[in-house]
Amino acid sequence: MFESHVFSRSTAHSAVLYWDKPAAAKAGAQYTVYLDGQPVATCGRTHFTLTDLRSQSDYQADVFFGHQCVGSCVFRTTPVKNRLDVTEAPFWARGDGKTKNTAALQRAIDACGAGDAVYIPAGIYLTGALRLHSNMELYLDEGAILQGTAEIVDYQPRIPSRFEGTEMRCYSSLLNLGTLDHAAGPNCENVVIRGKGTIASGGRELAEKIIADEQEHLKDYLAEHAALVAECENERTIPGRVRPRLINMSNCRNVWVHGLTLKNGASWNQHMIYSDNITTDHCRFVSEGVWNGDGWDPDSSTNCTLFACEFATGGDAVAIKSGKNPEGNKIGRPSAHIYVFDCRSTAGHGICLGSEMSGGIEDVQIWDCDLTNSWSGIEIKATPKRGGYVRGVSVRDCTASRLLVHTVPYNDDGEAAPRQPVFSHLSFERLTLTGRGLRDGSFENVEPIELAGFDTPGHELRDVVLDGITVENETGTMTLPVQYCRGLTIRDLTCAA
């Protein structure tokens, strides 16, 4: 993972521990957690939450897999934060579901120092775009709903952002962290967004309003560039690129999102661009009915960890990205050291790498995920125009509808990169593939495995391992389509009726 094998995120009285899955551990492995030398729990997942801790105190946690020490970490709990209740003086927000609270909430956020936490109690707090800053915490209590409006005006001004791999000005997101600069490091850091409540935006209604407004604004451009529009997924693609996210992080470092329901962004729900050390855990992502409504999207970002989350999305549950075509190649900031484990999909497209991957994607580790109820399962994709690479991917002990490594034709507008992409060094171990994809609430039979590289010599799919794969279907037989591939190893492939 990073420099050791056990990591922590702590509050005043609790700590979430998480660790890399040992190479010898298979599905159902058990771990013993020690705190200051004493065993406190046995668990079957690669994370555990410690509770009833003392504030401002140092602890050592050790994790064992059998007799093997997975690793240790020393952590310190935080001080008890000073609570800035948004419903009290001098903020006076009203959680009645009717009052627009943008100004009141922003005042509380602006007043929040490193020793404070903006506290949102139960209620529905209608708001427009909000702007967070370094060294702050936002806490939503149980029953608290931070509800973004469905009005375009509440997401002004447009801000520098990146969407589907291209930098552009997009509407402000509901929560905005940092300022986009592909040539710089972090300008927003040490932010905690947590609690038991819900952060929701205007979803499909807001998305449709923005697309219609942008289509009118761009009607002459779209008419003059019909060939460009034809290269897109559909006629809404270009107008839809200015939609806000639910949570947008640009040039951020050390952000923790924990315990929340993240719901109905007008496009993607959590988008991290040029960011580092982002942890999201124990969250629920909901965006069914929102076109292109991805869940968790690291984009030219590093050291991003996602675990113990559930997805019911209108797009990919997870989409790992790094820019598009020549711009992405030139900026050249890869997404790397991405870890996804113990996540579950109930609707949506699954876990995807690409298709915007021109800056490169490397060191992606996925384990213990259930993507049975998804359309694409586990997918690595790009168009021939992209350039760049995907390499060093490991997927272990997962169940999915299917496994796809292939080229795709959509989102293919714009100038091509000087060379085709390369997918290489991909390992898939102990997967169960159902061969049934979930789309629009119904299951369809799909090819359980597709492997394809690119047709230019030197850009074939390289060094792929399929080990311990079980394919389920009604007949007990299958085909394995392989195209433009060099160095494919297959061990213990089982086809079961």
Protein language model regions, located:
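Extracellular/periplasmic carbohydrate-active domains that bind, remodel
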Residues: 1-497
